């Protein structure tokens, strides 16, 4: 889970990059772009609160100069949100806990929130809003 702290903290953390250990890591190919795609179902009545917390995560990303994910809000169906992240180094970004961008983003979130404890609480508060999420790895031809 290297490239992660990805969606925005918990979206960065909880909903991104759930690579299953039994699944093999696909080979890297130069003719494709790799992404993670996460769909999120929030608990009833919590979407507005989730949007407010996501804004804080996005602000930390903008401050740190790290890449923002592409976010879509659903108007129908089971899920409320889909988040896609480009994996700069392909599936290798899924190994380990932190990428350099993730660490930079995390430090910006700590500075923004005033302490590491406050940043951790923000992540926990966000995670409490999630009823379920599913993350998959996808590739797209260049």
Residue ranges and their predicted role:
Residues 1-4:
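Positively charged n-region of N-terminal signal peptides that target proteins for export
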């Amino acid at each position: 889970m290297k490239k992660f702290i990805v969606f925005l903290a918990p979206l960065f953390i909880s909903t991104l990059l759930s690579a299953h250990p039994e699944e093999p890591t696909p080979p890297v190919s130069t003719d494709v772009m790799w992404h993670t795609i996460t769909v999120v179902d929030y608990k009833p009545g919590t979407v507005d609160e989730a949007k407010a917390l996501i804004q804080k995560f996005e602000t930390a990303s903008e401050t740190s100069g790290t890449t923002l994910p592409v976010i879509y809000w659903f108007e129908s169906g089971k899920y409320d949100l889909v988040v896609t992240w480009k994996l700069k180094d392909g599936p290798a970004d899924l190994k380990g806990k932190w990428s350099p961008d993730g660490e930079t983003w995390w430090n910006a979130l700590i500075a923004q929130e005033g302490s590491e404890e406050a940043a951790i609480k923000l992540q926990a508060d966000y995670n409490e809003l999630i009823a379920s999420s599913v993350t998959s790895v996808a590739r797209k031809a260049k």
